[in-house]
A protein has these predicted regions:
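Short, well-ordered coil/turn residues at beta-beta hairpins
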Residues: 34, 131-133, 138, 172, ...
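Glycine/Thr-rich phosphate-binding loops of Rossmann-like dinucleotide-binding domains
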Residues: 138-139, 179-180, 256-257, 295
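A Rossmann-like FAD-binding core segment of flavoenzymes
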Residues: 11-14, 92-111, 116-118, 123-125, ...
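Beta1-alpha1 glycine-rich phosphate/pyrophosphate-binding loop at the start
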Residues: 20-21, 28-83, 173-200
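FAD-site-proximal beta/loop scaffold in flavoenzymes
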Residues: 146-163, 250-300, 307, 314
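FAD-binding core/adjacent interface of flavoenzyme oxidoreductases
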Residues: 2-5, 9-31, 99-167, 245, ...
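A conserved FAD-binding loop/helix module that cradles the flavin
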Residues: 43, 179-181, 288-333
Length: 342
């Protein structure tokens, strides 16, 4: 079964008129790359620390696709991804963050600063926060984005399995990840199946484990057709089976290219490895949100943003204090009025 990126083609950022282009050779304290929840949260913190912040938003983040999330703290009635992002943008800009509707093409470490080559110019930053996220893989099907918006196709059972309790659920993906996700969803519904194109796509071992958990395996699924309510599995013989929800357990592509450019350590899947303050293996470069090796959740991204921003601010305070201390002995040594008898 072919797949494509859930985000579709890259879109221009639907940004406020308050957003500006950075111009050529701008300097800022911190450059944040990525305008999703984690990047925007970092910008809020850093701006409130009185740091100059440029945030680059290419406008193709996965949060835009969220129809409504009910597990984001503080929103008892749920919140759509677009609404959450709009609130975060307004909050960041209210404290002075400059949001740039542009992507970052490259990141280079230079003495005393990092240089970001953007689609509108070059920016020099003392610190960099990477919040570049991931791109979900999803099944190739007509009307995918509408199906995601309608909640018929879902990408995150941790986020929204609560909302599909007792429904007819199908899972598509490589057999190991599909089985893992199906077993997770089995806690919420008894009607779970794994779908595939051909019988050889799912091994006997996986079938046995699925069967033991009461999970069916549907072979010869040729097409997926969204309906007003649910989705039809179209079999090779032309027959159909209606389900309520399809979960795509197809993995994602991690946007860690900028981190790799400066030599930051990543795992085998491309996720950026971070320390307790969201710092990467490169001093001055931090990673927050889904691009970092952790649970891909908005709340986790918020926490990482707070940790990274506070660490950046404290490190810059220490640098400033250190430079003052280094200058003081030199000034004393050059004093034109030495003490008598000295």
């Amino acid at each position: 079964m072919l797949h494509k990126h859930a985000s579709g083609t890259t879109r221009a950022c639907a940004c406020s008129a308050a957003m500006i282009n950075p111009g050529i050779n701008r300097f800022c304290d911190v450059a944040v790359v990525g305008g999703g929840p984690a990047g925007l949260a970092a910008a809020v913190y850093l701006s409130r620390f009185l740091r100059s912040v440029l945030l680059f938003d290419a406008g193709d983040g996965r949060a835009e696709l969220i129809p409504k999330t009910h597990n984001c703290p503080g929103f008892p009635d749920g919140v759509s991804g677009k609404d959450l992002l709009a609130r975060l943008r307004a909050q960041a800009m209210a404290y002075g963050t400059e949001i740039v509707a542009a992507g970052v093409k490259s990141l280079t470490a230079r003495p005393g600063a990092f240089v970001l080559a953007t689609t509108t110019g070059h920016v020099h930053a003392s610190r960099v926060v990477l919040a570049t996220g991931v791109v979900d893989r999803a099944p190739a099907m007509h009307g995918l984005r509408k199906a995601i918006a309608a909640g018929i196709v879902r990408l995150c059972p941790v986020c929204d399995a609560y909302e599909v309790q007792g429904q007819r659920i199908a899972v598509v993906g490589p057999e190991r990840s599909a089985l893992k996700e199906a077993l997770y969803l089995r806690h919420y519904s008894r009607d779970i199946c794994i779908i595939c194109n051909y019988p050889e796509d799912v091994s006997g071992s996986t079938r046995a484990k699925a069967g033991a958990a009461g999970i069916a395996v549907r072979d010869f699924v040729d097409d997926l057709v969204p309906r007003n309510s649910g989705l039809d599995l179209v079999m090779a013989d032309g027959s159909t089976e209606r389900i309520d929800v399809l979960y795509a357990a197809m993995g994602c592509d991690v946007r860690s290219e900028l981190a790799m450019e400066v030599g930051a350590h990543c795992d085998e899947d491309g996720y950026i490895l971070i320390g307790p303050h969201a710092q990467t293996s490169i001093e001055g470069v931090y990673a927050v949100g889904d691009v970092a090796k952790a649970l891909n959740q908005i709340a986790v991204g918020f926490g990482q943003a707070a940790l990274a921003s506070t660490h950046i601010h404290n490190a810059m305070l220490a640098e400033r204090a250190g430079s003052r201390c280094e200058k003081e002995p030199e000034a004393h040594h050059q004093s034109p009025n030495p003490r008598p008898g000295g």
